[in-house]
Amino acid sequence: MVRTRRIWVTAAAVLALVGGVSGTAAHARPVPAAAESGGKLPPGWRIDEGRSAPQLVWRSARQVPMGDARVEFRADGRLLGVPKPERDGHSFRLGLEAARTGELTDLQVWSGGRRLDTRSAATEAPAAAAGPPAPLPAGPVDPGKPGHYRTTTGEYRLKSVRLPGFSVPVEMSAVVVAPTGVTGPRPLALFLHGRHATCYTPHGDDGQASGAWPCPAGTLPIPSHRGYLRDQRLLASQGYVTVSISANGINGQDWQAEDGGAQARSSLIRLHLGHWADWAQNPRQAPPIVREAPRADLSRVLLIGHSRGGEGVNRAALDSLYPPPAAQDGYHGKVSWHISGTVLIGPTVFGQNPVPDVPSLTVLPGCDGDVSDLQGEMYVDGTRAVSAGKALHSAVYVIGANHNFFNTEWTPGQAQAPAEDDFYDDPDRRDPVCSQGTATRLTADQEHRAGSTYIAAAARLFVAGDDKVRPLLDGSGRRAPSADPARVLSHAVGANRGAGFLPDGKVTVSGGRLCAAADPDPAAACLGEGAEGGSPHFAQWETARESGRNAVALRWTSVGATTRVKVARPVSLKGAEALALRVFVPPNTKGTRLDVAVTDTHGRRATLGRVRVDGLPGSERTASYWARELRVPLSAARRAGVDLSSVKSLEMTGRSSSGKAWLMDAWGWRPGTAAVRAAVLPRVDVGRLRVDEGDSGVRTYHVPVRVSGRGSGQIRLYVVDPATGTAKDRLVTVRPGGRAVDVPVEVRGNTRYGADLSYDVLVKAVHGAVVGSYRGGLTVHDDDPAPEVTVTPLADRVTEGSALKWRISLSKAADTDIGALFVPVPPGGGAPELSTKDVDPQWLADASGAAPDPERPLSKVDGLGLWLDIPAGRTSLDVSVPTVVDRVGEPAESVGFRQTGDDGTPLPDGLLLNGTVLDAS
């Protein structure tokens, strides 16, 4: 039997229908019923009866700015779904037919690792944070210095395009900044902004911005694509042709895309690149600004994406190497370009499937108030062991930077439209790291200058191939003076790193703990309970528990405690200069010291050296548990005769009196960047099949999973139980034409009304494969008509002190709870109305949270909404509402409740429930 979730039904809530019946019938809807303590929804939550299904609605007292991180509804730690935002910026709706069945307890709203539906009580001042670290030594080159070319700027606008899954065409507009006085073709840098409000009212009050598309009359598009002009001018002065493209049409519609719009953004990028490739061959067909610019060299392309734009450029790089399914793609031309690298600024990574063989730089803003879990770290961590590991994947952590100020059109005082600091500053509880004016927080200008410098660094390394800039990006501990006073730290994987110790693989740990990056059990999780803030390395994915994402947790209480990591297969460090470890310690801590040693398969051991690591400045609102790259030379091992071609274990010994640390990985390191060639890999895409339940019989359907490309590889397949929301996973070897990824689903037909049901499937690349569309499944539509609801009065004209009573009946039983919402309306004809002092005060409090005083008609009581709920399998329900004797002589009083629509307003043709209460005297 298929059931929807039960959201709230207590005795008081169920007994919330009042009055008689108009004699009409209405179609009922499935409504979930009970769950929070005492049967009440938490403040801000409600159920709205939709036209096809009920909706779980959360309304924020403060406007939630349109941002890049997804707003997610969770219950008891599991993901329910991604709600649709309302245009008012306050309300979010999730169709309950799409959410998991089972009890809804502990309802919460999350976005980018930050909880939105509650705030920490300001009972005590936050602990002091560490100050900014000392400046690093300057690197051998400074990529932030402008070049010697003059620049020219212009725009182009092409015909809008239709993208799969989006009902409204998307604009093809861009701003170009190019060098002048240049001979020969020049590399191309393409920028894509993130998810921001799309339209604004000129000269309006702050906050008059929306996510509508197309923009309504009287409003203008927000020019988010013009927010990187400073970055474009710097690159253009250094000889790059730059273009920044607009994606408002995607931002206004991506709530309906299962992947958050990643595939649509990839299609848009490649549509622009396709035009640039054509214009390079046929300059006369190009827009004027493109004709004025040097010819673009499409064999040297750098993609720069901010926030969801970062996920878009990652997908575009993937799709350029491994073509996506044609039905889901908006670009069907040739790939006449080569992506040399990507820059991802505060990016989302909902699928956690980065492209492994394209070099990348991920910018992590330490005070990001939007994608606040800094999930973009997965563009580094998620590439390990997937392919050959030759591409450099770097992350730079910018202390004190927020999310928005990398884009001037998202920066107050610089933007045309309303803009704000995304790191919300609570005046009653200022953050010691990220509140404006603290020693660590950057100004908008300082932040943007740092961003420009590191974008230019990536261009110089990935496109121009200048290895002198690498120490700024690969954990070598060098800085670019142009980014001062920003403190920018880096670590990396790939490039000339060799084999290493990877906790995700087959390892055993003694003296420490092999911990899970994502696990609801605090004893298994790496951070567990008590951590102040979060870790980008442990950003949560779609499932509460994941397999194969691990780290090594160290904790010691005396000098000399040792943690040993032993690998199943010996590691070769031959040819490496140093062992590079990525280690983090708790924020704001100083002077953690560790001795590092290795042992070979013959038992020869050598202590390589001692490292010291300090924590980043952090607070409970930051993701500051981020790994620093620490290097120890291998010279001591060579002197000790250790066979570096066959190392079996790594040891870390605490030399502080006590401490905690986490090891992400360790690699053989030598300088330089290797030549990168994309491997031939199979690509996996999960689709979604939608079927009708049918009236009888059992049908077996298979979740559509497409494997394309060549070769074979491994993925991890997660199948989510629709009843519990928990996921089971298994490793699967995939190859084109194979049937290893087979998820059968049995659908049993019947003629009873029920809820739609989704069987979700998720995939992640593990080794030798890439993943495009990471989520899909089977959605079963219940195709049976809803039963009719009628109301029979049992006592609809009573003396005060008695209860009004009715029987709610269905024309036939359903396989789901059936409910409807009613709101009070004034009686017709000006009749006296039942007031707050005419009903039982406890019933009033349970039904609405209101008190009787001041006395007012029930139709004036905020939040008074009356639910009926008939449990699955039953056909009737008796309900009542208690009245009280008020000892005040008065005429007969009436009350009326009208059935509501999606928005909670009464339906003109909905059921009308009337009742009359007579004076007892």
Regions found by a protein language model. Give the residues of each.
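Secretory targeting and sorting signals
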Residues: 1-28
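Alpha/beta-hydrolase active-site loop
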Residues: 226-231, 258-298, 303, 317, ...
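Short boundary segments that mark the start of a structured unit
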Residues: 30, 676-921
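Extracellular ligand-binding interfaces
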Residues: 74, 549-646, 653-663, 668-675
